[in-house]
Design a protein with these regions (language model features):
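Cystatin/cathelin-like cysteine-protease inhibitor module
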Residues: 7-111
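Sec-dependent bacterial lipoprotein signal peptides
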Residues: 1-7
């Protein structure tokens, strides 16, 4: 039972991340083969770290500038999804931080 819950959460996370990439990637149609390679949770990421990741996101050329993150308080517990994907045949890896409901991207960083 635990495995199916975990797989369900991972599948939900992949959908949220795919929607985020579709909206904010510089070339969303060039992104393909998105895979979650690690999925976990954390309670150690604070508002300051999230703020730095969000500010850094504007410098990543694979993404549009001025990303609009969902409104609302950021939960103490976050889910972490490390993904791999390709853009124009080049492989990349990013880490996404999702809220405790796995309904929105809170922040992300490149690896």
């Amino acid at each position: 039972m635990l495995l199916s819950v975990s797989c369900g959460r991972q599948h939900q996370a992949k959908g949220v991340i795919q929607d985020f990439i579709d909206q904010y990637a510089a070339e969303p149609s060039a992104c393909s083969s998105i895979s979650i390679v690690k999925f976990d949770s954390t309670q150690t990421v604070n508002d300051s770290i999230i703020g730095r990741m969000r500010a850094n996101a504007d410098t990543i050329q694979r993404y549009k500038k001025s990303i609009k993150y969902a409104d609302g308080a950021i939960s103490k517990k976050l889910f972490i999804a490390r993904i791999t994907y390709t853009v124009n045949d080049a492989e990349y890896s990013d880490t996404y931080y999702l809220d405790d409901q796995i309904s929105r991207v809170v922040a992300f960083k490149t690896n």
